[in-house]
Each structure stands twice: as C-alpha cells, then as structure tokens.
Regions:
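Radical SAM enzyme [4Fe-4S]-AdoMet core and its adjacent flexible, acidic
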Residues: 38-158, 165
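Flexible mid-to-C-terminal extensions adjoining Fe-S/redox cofactors in radical SAM and related proteins
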Residues: 176-255
Length: 255
C-alpha cells in the first residue's frame, strides 16, 4: 500500500493545505522547531525581512492537528536544550499537547571536525533521559518505547525516496539540495548512479562490535548516511539509555 509523509517548517501549513494533503493520502506531517519563540525566531526567520515565524507555525499546528497527524521535532544542541521544556509548555498552554506527538532530536554534526555545540550521542542520551523524567514528573506522556526495526531507515530501502521542491529525488534527508547526491527526478525517473548505489549496497551491520551488541535490533548499526559519507560509527543513544526508556515508559502508563 502507498503511504507518504512530509517534513515542513510549518509556516504555510494552513487548514486548506492540510485538507489537500489529506486527499493525497499524506497523513503524517513532521514540523521542525528550534525552540520556543525567542530561540526559533532567531534561527528560522523569513528570508525576506527576517520576520519571525514561530507564532504563525503555532497557529497552523492548532488549526491542523485534528486534520493530520502532526509530529513536532525539536532540534536540540548545547545552546538551546535548556529551553526545550518551555517549547513543550507552549503546546500545553494552547491545549494541544495531547493532539500532537513531540520529541527531541540532536542537531547532526555532519562535518569531519566535531562541532562543540553539538551533542555526542552519549551526551544526548543523558539529556534525553533528564527531559523524559521532567516531563513524567509534570504528568506528560511522551516516552515511546523502542521497538525492533527491520531497516535502518528509508535511505537504504529500494522503494523509498525524498522529493525536494524542484522534484529532485534523494535517498536521505541530509542529502537534499546537494546535487551530487541526487538520484533522479519525479518527471524523468530514477537514475541508477553512484549515489543510489552506495545506499542500495549498504551493509547495515558489518562491524564486530555491532554483532555482539544487545541493542543491535533497535539500531542496526546506526545512520547509513554518517557511516557511508563520514565513516562515523558512533553508537546510538539507545546504547546508553534503552533500559531507562523502558523504565520511564512503564512509569508513564500510570501518569
């Protein structure tokens, strides 16, 4: 069966657009935020005039959360992690925290040299647990139990593609707009080039340390993009906090 989702900044996600997406069988929408208004508006303003965007996005989420399944992804690093509770509280104050999904995700360091503002996976695993605990103590259920996966992500699936605004096809979010990783176009079809070959021939688990790891069914060796392009083999945060997540999930059942 066919399924599709979109990732958007949420600025143009009006009710009319939401109904159009629904008709096209696009039920799931991920909206990426960088923090509460004061942080988000500093990082994600309009190109024309640097006007703020947060308030418009929040209104759109309120208008559309009963039409589509909306997932709020909060990008976090060492400079904005302290504000993520305030962001979640915005949805609580507006009465929609139970009508959306909310999770935090570390800003990816895709450079060859470590960025001091980005969390390592070990650092993020600790921040994630502290965040979950704070949410639990406030009576919020946002802890999701990790489940075994059968494919690391859509990047290595032969039948999954990302489409950018120009109609170009890519295999990974991190590759979008980088033309050297383009694998075709919706109008001309898929191009069986080097970029596509790297993903389709990717071996998810080819390291000895992964073979004997109890977390292997939950991560399958980590991010293919980082492993292929940057040769990074940093263990998933689940390596460090899987047992804590299960505990917090159990506790959340009684919240």
């Amino acid at each position: 069966s066919y399924s599709a989702s979109i990732v958007t900044n949420g600025y143009l996600l009006t009710k009319d657009v939401a109904y159009q997406l629904k008709k096209l069988d696009i039920d799931n929408v991920q909206i990426t935020l960088d923090g509460p208004a004061k942080i988000h508006n500093e990082r994600r303003y309009l190109k024309a005039g640097k006007k703020p965007t947060f308030e418009t996005i929040l209104k759109n989420v309120k208008d559309c959360c009963e039409i589509l399944n909306i997932n709020i992804r909060a990008n976090v690093d060492k400079t904005n992690m302290s504000c993520v509770d305030e962001l979640f509280e915005e949805f609580n104050k507006n009465g929609i925290k139970d009508k959306i999904s909310f999770y935090i995700s570390p800003v990816s360091d895709i450079s060859e040299n470590p960025n001091p503002k980005c969390f390592t996976n070990l650092e993020f695993s600790k921040e994630q647990m502290e965040f979950y605990l704070r949410m639990l103590n406030k009576g919020n259920k946002i802890v999701a139990i990790p489940k075994p996966i059968y494919g690391v992500c859509s990047a290595i699936s032969p039948f999954s593609f990302l489409i950018d605004p120009l109609g170009d096809l890519y295999k990974c979010w991190n590759d979008v707009s980088r033309k050297e990783f383009r694998v075709g176009n919706v109008y001309t079809g898929v191009e069986y080039n080097t970029a596509l070959s790297k993903y389709l021939n990717y071996e998810a688990v080819n390291q000895e340390k992964c073979m004997h790891c109890s977390v292997l069914p939950l991560c399958l060796g980590g991010c293919p993009n980082e492993n292929i392009l940057l040769n990074k083999r940093e263990c998933s945060p689940l390596k460090y906090n899987a047992s804590n997540i299960v505990e917090y999930y159990y506790r959340s059942l009684n919240v």
